A protein has these predicted regions:
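An active-site-proximal structural segment forming one wall of the substrate-binding cleft
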Residues: 90-102, 123-176, 200-209, 213
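Active-site-proximal loop/turn and secondary-structure-junction residues that shape catalytic pockets
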Residues: 71, 108-110, 179-181, 225-227
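Extended amphipathic alpha-helical segments with heptad-repeat/coiled-coil character used for oligomerization
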Residues: 41-43, 185-254
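Sec-dependent signal peptide cleavage junction
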Residues: 23-34
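Substrate-binding cleft of secreted/luminal carbohydrate-active enzymes
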Residues: 224-228, 232-318
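N-terminal substrate-binding region of glycoside hydrolase catalytic domains
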Residues: 32-146, 270, 279-317
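A structural signal for short, well-ordered beta-strand segments and their strand-loop junctions
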Residues: 102-105, 172-178, 218-223
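N-terminal Sec-pathway targeting helices
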Residues: 2-19, 26
Length: 318
């Protein structure tokens, strides 16, 4: 009986301590924060304008930066990656320290003013020079043969290396899927005699390595390809501000249909509500001056950006 009474007293005492502690917390521990109305503009994390990663000065509200890498820059010698140069030019240590994130695009063909290649010389030799040298309205350069099996295999290996280096610490939040076509935009100028892009079964082999190498990054494609719908991707438009091209992009998204580069009747899939789950990105068009885009035709530019449900917009870097 004495033991039961002692146990009861202990329980009562414990209960009183809990009640007292709760009362103390309610009086002294609970804090109420009242926020005042402000006209100050705040940046949304991982949204908004993404300047180039090599910019020395960026606004305090910037949380995203854009980094594109050519294969020639990354792997000048087979199996030897120039991480030091890539990191120095794109200030990756700085952005990590400042808590910022990157949009990454890997590119194999950027038309320029001089004859050049954006794939390394060793890869040009390994693929038996399969591809097309061009000098056309876009500029000069070299378009690889993306159907070439050596090209496909080496691409997978290099993307894996990119993932090992940049895909493990959250630095890269978005992948604007490049790899194929001029500027990595998944199209080539067929009228200039350049071989058309591969069909879906081959295009998918360029896409899958990215999903595996960057499992925590969100991937965006230039068009609503059927393979993109299957894997769940966002979309990007590199002609932002150019009304005709942007309206065509909207039509691809709303209707799907034929991919004109390969004449696949169902190469594109309607993805009209993609923005509800996935990002909408891209860059401002280079065919219109920034004064026209952001001054003369500002209302038109704003309306096109709103219609695209834009998540982020990058700088035209090259």
């Amino acid at each position: 009986m004495a033991k039961c009474q002692k146990r009861s007293l202990v329980l009562v005492g414990f209960g009183l301590l809990v009640i007292i502690a709760a009362g103390v917390w309610m009086v002294f521990g609970r804090k109420t924060q009242i926020y005042e109305k402000t006209e100050e503009v705040f940046g949304n994390p991982l949204m908004g304008y993404a300047p180039c990663a090599w910019e020395e000065t960026v606004g305090e509200d910037i949380s995203l930066l854009y980094m594109d890498i050519t294969w020639a820059e990354l792997e000048p010698e087979e199996g030897k990656y120039d991480w030091e140069k890539i990191e120095r030019e794109n200030q990756t240590d700085r952005w990590r320290e400042e808590g910022k994130h990157l949009v990454l695009r890997f590119v194999c063909d950027i038309p320029g003013e001089e004859k050049h290649m954006d794939i390394p010389q060793w890869l040009y030799d390994k693929t038996d020079h399969a591809g097309t040298w061009y000098d056309m309205e876009y500029g000069k350069g070299y378009a690889p043969d993306y159907n070439n099996e050596q090209m496909i295999q080496y691409h997978k290996r290099t993307v894996n290396a990119l993932g090992e280096h940049f895909g493990r610490d959250g630095l890269v939040s978005y992948i604007e899927l490049g790899s194929l076509g001029h500027w990595g935009e998944w199209h080539v100028n067929i009228s200039a005699g350049i071989q058309s892009l591969p069909e879906e079964s081959v295009r998918e082999r360029y896409m899958i390595p990215w999903t595996e190498a960057f499992p925590d990054s969100m991937i965006l494609m230039r068009r609503p390809f059927s393979e993109g719908e299957h894997y769940g991707t966002g979309l990007y438009n590199d002609m932002t501000g150019q009304p005709e091209s942007t309206e065509e992009w909207f039509r691809w998204i709303n209707e799907g249909g034929e991919f004109d580069q390969t004449h696949e009747k169902k190469g594109l899939s309607a993805m009209k509500d993609f923005w509800k789950k996935f990002p909408s990105g891209g860059e401002f068009t280079s065919s219109i001056t920034m004064k026209e885009l952001l001054d003369t035709n500002l209302n038109q530019t704003i309306n096109l950006i709103k219609k695209a449900h834009t998540t982020f917009r990058t700088e035209n870097s090259r």
